[in-house]
């Protein structure tokens, strides 16, 4: 994803600043998105951002209200651990027992905190290793922690943890997410084009091309089904959410166009997100590639030419025709003499 964004924008991701106030706003609200839709229903700006776009992590963002890069690193630790967040850090933070900065998020937090409290380095390391592997604490370790004024809530939190993420991994993940968020804020069309390219299998062009009302209606239809929604619909919903956000920012989809669209990738074209041929219902990956490759060798002259050289079957041909891809092409090369 990041390489495609670099190719489309010309912006080197390694030059993207870690600290950008506008980018940070999408992790605690929607201000940085410049939403144009007055009836916009979402309260998060992190849809489509790796690590931060899922419903689970969006709830974390609500509970923690991150304000800085370091907060995002902690959230990454919470989300990748087992029994680190649910029934543990979440309850401590929401109840006010601990702040996000105090709660345990990555394995390094434990050793650093215990050393700060005065626990000997070797013991702090041993405790960290036991906790991160889900082995809890011995009575002796608990007593040592109490002797150094480690609060009871911290000791109990350690005993609940089954697995912990290393801080270095969390930092690497968040750096990537932060860079992608930068493109989302400052290069929105390119961001959405790259996102939908990755999710094309779950993209329904018959809904998205109709615009924001149709997208919202389809989202609500799937949500109403609840647990009765199919796996395909569950996979479709996050893609619809990102499409809804995109349209709410004032951007549009453009139907696939012969001679301009790519076979597989969504493109930025005239300020819109241009669909690839593979996004058309009934057009598979192989057909889309062959269709585009044959056109690049020699432009199609007729619909019959598309069928023969492009190896496009009748179903795909009908969908292309309905989509407008074949507009301007005569059906055959035969000419009437009378």
Predicted regions and their residues:
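Noncatalytic, beta-rich nucleic-acid-contacting surfaces in large DNA/RNA-processing enzymes
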Residues: 1-338
């Amino acid at each position: 994803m990041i390489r495609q964004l670099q190719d489309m924008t010309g912006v080197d991701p390694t030059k993207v600043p870690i600290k950008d106030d506008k980018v940070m706003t999408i992790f605690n609200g929607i201000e940085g998105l410049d939403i144009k839709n007055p009836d916009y229903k979402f309260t998060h700006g992190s849809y489509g951002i790796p690590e931060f776009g899922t419903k689970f992590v969006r709830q974390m963002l609500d509970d923690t209200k991150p304000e800085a890069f370091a907060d995002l690193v902690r959230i990454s630790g919470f989300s990748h651990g087992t029994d680190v967040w649910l029934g543990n850090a979440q309850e401590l933070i929401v109840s006010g027992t601990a702040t996000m900065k105090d709660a345990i998020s990555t394995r390094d937090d434990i050793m650093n905190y215990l050393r700060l409290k005065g626990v000997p380095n070797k013991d702090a390391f041993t405790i960290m290793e036991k906790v991160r592997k889900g082995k809890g604490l011995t009575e002796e370790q608990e007593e040592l922690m109490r002797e150094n004024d480690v609060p009871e809530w911290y000791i109990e939190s350690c005993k609940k943890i089954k697995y912990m993420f290393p801080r270095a991994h969390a930092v690497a993940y968040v750096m990537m997410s932060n860079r992608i968020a930068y493109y989302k804020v400052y290069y929105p069309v390119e961001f959405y084009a790259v996102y939908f390219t990755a999710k094309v299998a779950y993209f329904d062009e018959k809904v998205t091309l109709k615009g924001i009302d149709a997208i919202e209606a389809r989202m609500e239809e799937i949500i109403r089904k609840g647990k009765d929604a199919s796996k395909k619909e569950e996979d479709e919903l996050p893609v619809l959410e990102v499409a809804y956000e995109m349209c709410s920012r004032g951007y549009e989809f453009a139907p696939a166009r012969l001679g301009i669209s790519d076979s597989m990738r969504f493109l930025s074209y005239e300020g819109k997100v241009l669909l690839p041929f593979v996004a058309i219902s009934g057009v598979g990956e192989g057909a889309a590639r062959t269709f585009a490759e044959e056109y690049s060798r020699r432009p199609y002259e007729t619909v019959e030419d598309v069928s023969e050289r492009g190896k496009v079957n009748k179903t795909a041909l009908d969908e292309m025709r309905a989509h407008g891809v074949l507009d301007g092409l005569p059906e055959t090369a035969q000419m009437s003499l009378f």
